[in-house]
């Protein structure tokens, strides 16, 4: 179920303050966050935000195409190593 429009997008307060502080600077600073549930807003465009995946911080460069998505969508928490191999070929 989608979030109500009158509530607006969710973004953690500390992350929002860091975004506003770094948007006026010329030097690009990587912002680290644990908030995977925060929505990407237009003020974040052209910033690099490192999102924690449970093990390390994954840098995500924000473009206009990513606005409206959640930060956690671009920081996978699980590694897929493939399905189990079948040993039937080697048994004969």
UniProtKB/Swiss-Prot annotation:
Keywords assigned: Ribonucleoprotein, Ribosomal protein, RNA-binding, rRNA-binding
Molecular function in Gene Ontology: rRNA binding; structural constituent of ribosome
PROSITE patterns: RIBOSOMAL_S19
Keyword RNA-binding on entry: yes
An individual GO BP term: ribosomal small subunit assembly
UniProt cross-references to InterPro entries, sorted A to Z: Ribosomal_uS19, Ribosomal_uS19_bac-type, Ribosomal_uS19_CS, Ribosomal_uS19_SF
Domain of life: Bacteria
GO cellular component terms, semicolon-separated: cytoplasm; small ribosomal subunit
NCBIfam families named in the record: rpsS_bact
Cited function: Protein S19 forms a complex with S13 that binds strongly to the 16S ribosomal RNA.
Similarity comment text for this entry: Belongs to the universal ribosomal protein uS19 family.
Name the UniProt record assigns to this protein: Small ribosomal subunit protein uS19
């Amino acid at each position: 179920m989608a979030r109500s429009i009158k509530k607006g997008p969710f973004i953690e307060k500390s992350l929002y303050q860091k975004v506003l502080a770094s948007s006026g600077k010329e030097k690009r600073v990587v912002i680290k966050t644990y908030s995977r549930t925060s929505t990407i807003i237009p003020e974040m465009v052209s910033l690099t935000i490192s999102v924690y995946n449970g093990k390390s911080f994954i840098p995500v460069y924000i473009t206009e195409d990513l606005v409206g998505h959640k930060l956690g969508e671009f920081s996978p928490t699980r590694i897929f190593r493939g399905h189990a191999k079948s040993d039937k070929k080697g048994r004969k």
